[in-house]
Amino acid sequence: MSDPELIRALSDLTLAVRGGIPVTIVDPRREASIYYSGRGIITAAGTLVVWAVPAEKRFLLKGFIVTAVVTDTLAAASGEAGILYFLDDADSDRPVCPIGAFDDTAAIGTWFNRDVPDLGSGIRGSALGSNLKIAFYEDIGGGNIEVQWCVWGDEIP
């Protein structure tokens, strides 16, 4: 490429940048057909159903926001920290996505917020009618965790 060609190419590029470069952004929150929100409390070995899927469909999780707060001091039965996570109840409670963790003796008021990780094109349920749940990996011997959530995605065949 000669100097005049290079100068012309740089000039064309400068004009294109000044006018803006067309960019397509895909936001999973705008591509979803299902939005569910709710709240619940996890105690002992409990779970929370966050997305009850019809028998002839699967969930396709595209995004979520979760806030979790210890509302009564925890005492994990194992004495180890525990992970709050989404699970697929049709596949032996297969972990779908981690949400966050609490120490085994987290005090009242301990909290975290998990905001919209990149799930790519989504995480699909393993079977028709599989529900999406939230659980705490360790059994809770005492205390509880209040969880508030919003999940979105699609229900697919």
Where are these regions (language model features)?
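Short, low-complexity N-terminal tether/leader segments at secretion or assembly junctions of large
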Residues: 1-27
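C-terminal interaction-tip segments
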Residues: 3, 7, 26-56, 71-76, ...
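Extended low-polarity, hydrophobic cluster-rich segments
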Residues: 10-13, 62, 97
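Extended extracellular/luminal ectodomain segments enriched in beta-structured repeat modules
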Residues: 55-63
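Short, surface-exposed beta-strand/strand-loop-strand elements in extracellular ectodomains
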Residues: 72-97
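Beta-sandwich interaction modules
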Residues: 107-129
